[in-house]
């Protein structure tokens, strides 16, 4: 039987996973919008990059949701829930390519920071699989921060 502290830790892990699931869903939506609306001399490069990133975001949404189910949690699954649980926004004010890229840098930095928190919670809960999942995500996210920041100059 789980102790009260273990149940609390498990709930914290599940809540944090739902926040990240929601962040990745909003990021997926934002990336689609950027993919469709990017304009300017870097259209072809960014159009392709945004597609690559939204494909990765879609995979990440599925991976986090399945991890939640595997540990007995319930992933949020509606747009309303995603919006309520996310710590990033869906934006909407970005019109230039550089504004779009800067918004992504900011979102990825937020996700990276919060993912480190998830790792700590998972490790406290002896949930090595969740911790490992987020270690891998941080590696990819930090790479994207570097690449997108380099684009901005």
From Swiss-Prot:
Coiled coil: none annotated. Pfam families: Ferritin (PF00210). It comes from the Bacteria. One of its GO terms (molecular function) is DNA binding. The keyword Cell division does not apply. The keyword DNA-binding applies. SUPFAM superfamilies: Ferritin-like (SSF47240). Induction: By oxidative stress and by growth in minimal medium lacking iron (Fe(3+)), or one of the divalent cations manganese, copper or cobalt. InterPro entries: DPS_DNA-bd, DPS_DNA-bd_CS, Ferritin-like, Ferritin-like_SF, Ferritin_DPS_dom. This is Metalloregulation DNA-binding stress protein. It comes from Bacillus subtilis (strain 168). The gene is mrgA.
């Amino acid at each position: 039987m789980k102790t009260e502290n273990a149940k609390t830790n498990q709930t914290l892990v599940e809540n944090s996973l739902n926040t990240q699931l929601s962040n990745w869903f909003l990021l997926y939506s934002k990336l689609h919008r950027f993919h469709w609306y990017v304009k300017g001399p870097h259209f072809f490069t960014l159009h392709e990059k945004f597609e690559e990133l939204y494909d990765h975001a879609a995979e990440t949404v599925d991976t986090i949701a399945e991890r939640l189910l595997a540990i007995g949690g319930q992933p949020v699954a509606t747009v309303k829930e995603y919006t309520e649980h996310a710590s990033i926004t869906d934006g909407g004010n970005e019109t230039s390519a550089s504004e779009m890229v800067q918004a992504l840098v900011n979102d990825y930095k937020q996700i990276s920071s919060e993912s480190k928190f998830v790792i700590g919670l998972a490790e406290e809960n002896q949930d090595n699989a969740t911790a490992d999942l987020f270690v891998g995500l941080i590696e990819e996210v930090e790479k994207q921060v570097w690449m997108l920041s380099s684009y901005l100059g």
